[in-house]
Every structure is written in structure tokens, then in C-alpha cells.
Amino acid sequence: LSLGACGNSNGDVAAESTAAATTEAATTEAATTEAAATEASTEAAEAVADEKSEGVMTYEEYMAADLDSEVVIEAYVQAKQSWWEDKATLYTQDQDGAYFIYNSVCSEEDYAKLVPGTKIKVTGYKTEWSGEVEIAEGATFEIEEGSYIAPVTDVTDLLGTDDLINYQNQFVAFKGMTVEASQDATGNDVAFLYNYDGSGEDGNDLYFNVSLNGQTYTFTVESYLCDNTTDVYNAVKNLKIGDTIDMEGFLYWYEGVNPHITSVTVK
């Protein structure tokens, strides 16, 4: 508003300007204090989230442990793949890395408690299967206090590099990739396959090829993790060769990178 419209004298304007400046300074200071408090709170929460109990390995110690040796880790459930006959397969992560837990001992009652963010302490044996480092079948766990959801990490630029495996099993993103043709059982070009060889049907795993910078990779929708009622399953079924897509999922490994995709967006 103009000064005339306000109907104030110069003295009133000066007083009002001083008051406004004081108020603005106080507001700015309060906002700065609040931001600092929020940051401190976040850092404290992250420190708590990353603090290990006595006898529990850090992620670095876990990765350095020999295959087939006993490991004890603490991590936070990010997703559940499946439960069957008191066995649960879990995607878990902490501040430093991720742990794939295959067929751990788990009652149906406990499985229901494992919502995303739940902290668990796992005791089992480290193993490797076709390049995938995991905690082997038969591990046990106990639920602990604490919660943490890992942020997504964009690893698009790491595709085709030796560094990518350092993010194995983490929740990651791939951006701007192109859908490439797969060949079905009759030799036709298709955007996806049911099972790796096209032998499956609706409800089975989906396999699809995507490329970046001239290199093609095979990604998967794991049907136990994301079944045929999920958005991602149906999004992949509707892909077209040549589509440009962004994706999120877990950086699984099988004879090379083979992510388990949980989200697809066509650009």
C-alpha cells in the first residue's frame, strides 16, 4: 500500500517501520532457532537410530565378516517379501547399509508386527547366493525399540560401475531409463515377461529390460513383494517398448544387478 493510502504521518511510518523491523528480526530469529532445533533433533534421532547394542556388528563389520560365519546385526524393516510356514524374508536397512534376510524364523503373529520402520536384532549366518550377500535361512530375530525409514538413494549414475554393489539391498532409485524389448517364447518383441523366460502367467514375477547409456539391464517385480494387485505390477504390465521411466526398489543381486522394483513412473 502507498503511504497516502495508509493515512499515516511520517512519524507514525517511522515508528511502524521500526516495529515491523523488530518483529521481522524476532520472527527470523525464532525461525532460525526452530530450524536449528529441528536439525539437532533429526541428528539426535539419526544417532540413536545408528547406535548399536553390545555385541552387535556395525555394517562395516558385517561386510568384513567371512561367508558362513555367524553374524549379529540390528536393522530396520523396510519391506517384507513373504511369510510361509513360520519363515519370513525381509528387506532391512540401517544408516550405513542394508541387509537381506532370507527365510528367518518367524511366527505369523510376529510377522504382522514387522511394519516398515520396525527395529530388529538378527542372529544368523552370512552367506552369498549368485552374488547376493544375505543372512541365510534359519536366522532368528527379536523386535526392539526404535524406528527408521531409509531415504531413497539415486544410483542411476552408478549403473555399470564397480561402486554399485556397495549399495546392495538398499532402497534406491533409477531415473530416465528406457524400456527395451524382451523376446517372448514365440520370438516376439514385448515390454515384459512373466518369469525370466516368459513361461509364467499373471501373478508370477515380471522381468523387463531397461537401458541407460547403451547398456541394458534386467529388472524384476518380485511377485511375493509386489503381487498382481499392486500399482507397480500393473504399471509394468502396461509398459511400452521405448518408454522412459523412473523407478524405485531394492538393489537385489543375481548374477549381477537385478533390482526388485517397487515403483515405476512413466515420464
What are these regions (language model features)?
Residues 46-267:
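OB-fold single-stranded nucleic acid-binding module
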Residues 16-19, 37, 41, 47-50:
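Intrinsically disordered, low-complexity repeat tracts enriched in Pro/Ser/Thr
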Residues 2-5:
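C-terminal motif of bacterial Sec signal peptides marking the signal peptidase cleavage site
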Residues 21-38, 42:
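Long, intrinsically disordered low-complexity tandem-repeat segments
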Residues 7-28:
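Short, low-complexity, disordered segments immediately C-terminal to signal peptides
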